[in-house]
Amino acid sequence: MPVELTGVRVVELGCGLGVPSLVAAARGAELVATDWAADAIDLLHQNAARNGLTLGAKVWDWRTPWEGTFDLALAADVLYEQRNVEPLVHALQQLAPEALIGLAGRPYEQQFLRSVEAVEIAERVVRVRTAGV
């Protein structure tokens, strides 16, 4: 990820506590964090406030349409259920020309990687994996 994200429109999918969102916002991104759980969005707003950051956040289920596009999509450790694979692939197709996806060794990652290959967006998806995870 570039160090400077000023003016870059970023969406995080399945933000949870929002660590990628917080980092991107701190680097100047115009950010919208999304999660299906309202509690996650509430915690993200608390974390942003504690860090002096401002960001957009919205409850969103990947299975529903989204209006608009972004420059970059982020997601970290979101492939813990098989039912998330195809909606994630579809969301990535629609939302942004580039994506950084943090992999955490979940069982459905290979299915996800095959799916992005099948719909010919694999070149738009950069996998990020921590050594030893």
Give residue spans per PLM region.
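S-adenosylmethionine-dependent methyltransferases
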Residues: 1-133
